[in-house]
């Protein structure tokens, strides 16, 4: 730094401003409905989410879909500065928790509207388990970077295994949580939907599956 405190303060201020301007992009992940098997429908929904949530705000977005282990997700990388008249705007979009939640809720609305138009029986709820009154712990999402870092992948997998075990204990004591969960996932749900969720929560263990099912 400078010996002169005024110059030093200006230098630090300039550095802070520079570092602040370095954040030119942000990422977001969205779970996609398992019910959509048609690739053309999945593409149509994805493009609609990108257009309505990002492009309409002047943001440039790059996206990719992944279906790892039957868990389809949409990954989006977008600019923080809108594209205006052939250049990036001087002002940067404020990307905080509130803004990300706003985008997530809009994406859920778009996904649900698309499902109604195409006749799918699903319902996406962007609210947290807590806000929905569901006493379960959400699992950690393993981002694309984690798949390239063995230690990170192992750590997240270990955490998710612990979460799975804690949720099982909760469900065995309060099996009604499964009904509350399924009710937020479907427009109309059936016994088969409940059984699928029970099987998923049991992790394929038939003993646990039968035990959970018997308590509903």
Predicted region positions:
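Solvent-exposed residues in well-ordered beta-strands and their adjoining turns
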Residues: 31-35, 79
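Broad gene-expression machinery/nucleic-acid interaction feature
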Residues: 25-27, 58-62, 71-75
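A short, contiguous, amphipathic alpha-helix enriched in charged residues
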Residues: 34-65, 101-110
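Single-stranded nucleic-acid nicking/binding segments centered on His-rich, glycine/basic loops
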Residues: 1-21, 39, 65-72, 79-216
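Glycine-rich, often proline-containing surface loops adjacent to acidic residues and nearby aromatics
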Residues: 21-31
């Amino acid at each position: 730094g400078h010996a002169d405190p005024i110059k030093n303060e200006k230098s630090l201020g300039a550095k802070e401003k520079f570092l602040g301007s370095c954040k030119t992009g942000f990422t977001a992940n969205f779970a996609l409905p398992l019910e959509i098997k048609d690739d053309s429908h999945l593409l149509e929904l994805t493009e609609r989410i990108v257009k309505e949530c990002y492009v309409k705000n002047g943001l440039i977005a790059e996206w990719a879909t992944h279906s790892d282990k039957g868990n389809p997700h949409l990954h989006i990388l977008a600019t923080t500065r809108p594209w205006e008249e052939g250049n990036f705007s001087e002002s940067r979009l404020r990307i905080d928790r509130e803004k990300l939640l706003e985008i997530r809720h809009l994406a859920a609305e778009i996904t649900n509207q698309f499902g109604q138009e195409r006749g799918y029986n699903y319902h996406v709820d962007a609210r947290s388990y807590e806000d929905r009154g569901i006493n379960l712990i959400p699992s950690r999402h393993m981002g694309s970077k984690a798949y390239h870092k063995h230690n990170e992948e192992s750590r997240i997998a270990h955490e998710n295994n612990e979460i799975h075990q804690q949720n099982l204990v909760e469900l065995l004591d309060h099996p009604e949580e499964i009904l509350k969960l399924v009710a937020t996932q479907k427009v109309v749900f059936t016994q088969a939907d409940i059984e699928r969720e029970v099987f998923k929560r049991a992790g394929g263990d038939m003993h646990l599956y039968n035990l959970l099912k018997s308590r509903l």
